[in-house]
Structure formats: structure tokens, C-alpha cells
Amino acid sequence: MSHAEDNAGTRRDFLYHATAATGVVVTGAAVWPLINQMNASADVKAMSSIFVDVSAVEVGTQLTVKWRGKPVFIRRRDEKDIELARSVPLGALRDTSAENANKPGAEATDENRSLAAFDGTNTGEWLVMLGVCTHLGCVPMGDKSGDFGGWFCPCHGSHYDSAGRIRKGPAPRNLDIPVAAFVDETTIKLG
């Protein structure tokens, strides 16, 4: 009887297969922790998105919250702020990109930088931006500061308008807008 006709497994074949299976299990057990450690930890997942109640924010005022370790400005603009921002021609801006994570590649018009309400209408009333100067990472002052009625960074003199667009000073870009949306009439979800 030749070896090719012998279909019954021998003890040696069993040991080969058992050793190979054990090797696969041991390798998987060793590699799994290395792969699993690349997943986000619970504290990082908890910081990835927050809900902000804006029911107490009056027209013409601003709320600052901390998200992912950075300040976020939430301003409820009045009609004067909205009209001022919408009257600026795109060609007069240093940075013509909206820098809006909700609208990648959009132009820096006021409509592309403001946040739509829960019903989807965008009156320009709400503006949500990271409160970090795009020059060197300082925190600009709000309350209609600076030469353009928006924010002013006292560190190096950057002036932002009422839509958070850079108008004067060394900052190269508009203030960044994070992923944000209303989840109901009075709550904004960041992230």
C-alpha cells in the first residue's frame, strides 16, 4: 500500500495540525492586545461629542464652553451683526474658505459659517466656532471686540469680524468651525 492511498490520518499528521492550530491561537492572543490598544479609550470617546443647552443665551450674547480641551464660542448674533457680516464681499476677505467642518470646501460667506436652526432654516443667528486664534493658538476676546465687531486676539493683534473671518493681523485663516448641529430647539451637539 502506497502512502497516497493511505487516507487515514496518522498520529504525526494529528500533531502537525494540533501544533498549527495552537500556534494560530497563541499568535492571535498575543496580537489582539496590540491591536486593541489602538482603539480610543473611554475618556476620549466621552469627550468626542458634547451637548450644549443654549436656551439661556440671549440675542447679542456669547457662551463659551470647553470641548476637546479647547474653548468653543457659541454666539447668538443680533440683526446688526448678521447684516454687518453679510455686507462684506468675498473679495475683501483674506481667507475665502469657510473653514467649516460641516461644509467642507465652502466659501467664507456668512451663510456658510453660521449654524442652521433645528428646523433647517439658516437665519444667521447662531455662530459656533473654536475659540483658538489661527495664528499661534491664543484665545481671542469676544463681546464684539476688535476693529470689525467680532473677536480680537491680544497676543499679536488679529482682528476677526462678526462671522469669525480674519480681517486684519497675522492670523492666516478664519476661526475654525467644528462639526455642530441642533438636536432640538435649544440643544447643540458638538462633535
Swiss-Prot record:
It comes from the Bacteria. It catalyses: a quinol + 2 Fe(III)-[cytochrome c](out) = a quinone + 2 Fe(II)-[cytochrome c](out) + 2 H(+)(out). The keyword Transferase does not apply. Keywords: 2Fe-2S, Cell membrane, Disulfide bond, Electron transport, Iron, Iron-sulfur, Membrane, Metal-binding, Translocase, Transmembrane, Transmembrane helix, Transport. Component of the ubiquinol-cytochrome c reductase complex (complex III or cytochrome b-c1 complex), which is a respiratory chain that generates an electrochemical potential coupled to ATP synthesis. Belongs to the Rieske iron-sulfur protein family. This is Ubiquinol-cytochrome c reductase iron-sulfur subunit. The lineage of its organism: Bacteria, Pseudomonadati, Pseudomonadota, Alphaproteobacteria, Rhodobacterales. The gene is petA.
